[in-house]
Amino acid sequence: MWGFVSTVVLECILGASQGLGVTRMNVPYLLGTIFTPNRDHAKLIGVFFHFVNGWIFSLIYVAVFQSLDRASWWLGGLFGLVQAIFVLAVLLPLMPALHPRVTNEQSGPTVERQLEPPGFFGLHYGIRTPISVLVAHTTFGIILGAFYAVK
């Protein structure tokens, strides 16, 4: 249950960040366009895919909590912070190599519409993008760590 709650909160933080102009990054859209060029369907597919990822990561967090025989808000927050830094420093810069519809920084114009590459720390989507990603993922971890009871 807490995996679902933490994923909903993460999605809300990222969605609010985009809606309030903190970032231009639309994570469901970015993920959904991996599977379809249809921009309307991409958002729905991306939300589903991001929720599945959230549940998978929740299980990973639980496995780590169980192996450490402890869970706490600060430990979950630390894991969330590490996850966010990995997303920002590794996954987002690799998007042009992983995503069929993200152009790279060296490409010129193409006939097909391409998505802008996020760049290091997602800075191509705005200078405050790293802040929203760090806050969302750290909050995700805090919720899991605070409410998961190690048995």
Segments from the language model and where they lie:
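Juxtamembrane/disordered regions of integral membrane proteins
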Residues: 1-151
